[in-house]
Amino acid sequence: MKKSHFFSPPQKLTQDSHWVALVGNPNCGKTAIFNLLTGLNQKVSNYPGITVEKKEGTVYAQGDKTFNLLDLPGTYSLSAESFDEQIVSDQVLSWAKGENPPAVIVSVVDASNLSRNLYLTTQLLDLDIPMIVVLNMMDQLKDSSQIEIQKLKKELGVSAVVPISAKMNWGLDALKSAIQKSLVNLAQTNHQSQWINQDISDQIKLLIEPHFSSSKFAAAHALRHISRNESLNGEDSHIEAIRNSILELGYNTDTLEA
């Protein structure tokens, strides 16, 4: 069985201290943001059994408030194709099962390549965890007005969309404020999930309902495994049966996730 590399947040948490997950594609500037937010207040170690770094830190916000920040390895999606991506996939899967999820997810995207970067963001939205989208590298855009911030916030249904530039060191205070506000509100995000045909949804429910606390994430996760011919924690025979049932309904399982 595949070994998981779950993150255990710092144990010395108080009612005024929360932990936040920093997630994003490789080379989106995520770690630079982590370093700017935490400064020297960070701890770097390795995930068990591998050389992938695990970075945790403490961020000091307004009013002497603090929150703990975890910088997850960069990944393009939750369908793991490397050790780094497997760590993120395992971690997110544990959150979907209700195992100590973060209070807020900060999804960092490259503002100059939204279409590619937002794929991971939309996958994470199915967790129903409050999310802040960070548009990094805004300094590289010839015309920053081409991104309609409020429209993007509304369409994604996230707590905030914050434009920043880690390279130019601007926008970090706005990001801290947005995180702090989300931690105070701890409100569920409202967003429109990917539509799934009812016939397919009924088949998927047979597989995923016992395993997840978030039905939206569970459906999306099961859909990925069915369409990609992947295993799911010993449920291979069930997946194959559901895949065959969907084929009998006249749907192509190879294109369900598209």
PLM segments and residue spans:
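Conserved G1/Walker A P-loop phosphate-binding module
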Residues: 1-83
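Residue-level signature of catalytic and energy-coupling elements of molecular machines
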Residues: 33-34, 52, 69-71, 88, ...
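Amphipathic alpha-helical transducer elements in NTP-driven molecular machines
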Residues: 49, 53, 82-85, 89, ...
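Conserved nucleotide-binding/hydrolysis micro-motifs of P-loop NTPases
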Residues: 49, 74-75, 111-115, 137-142, ...
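Conserved C-terminal guanine-recognition region of P-loop GTPase G domains, centered on the G4
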Residues: 60-64, 87-160
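Short hinge/gating elements
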Residues: 72-75, 161-163, 190-191, 251-254
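Canonical P-loop GTPase G-domain recognition
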Residues: 139-193
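Extended helical scaffolds that flank P-loop GTPase cores
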Residues: 182-258
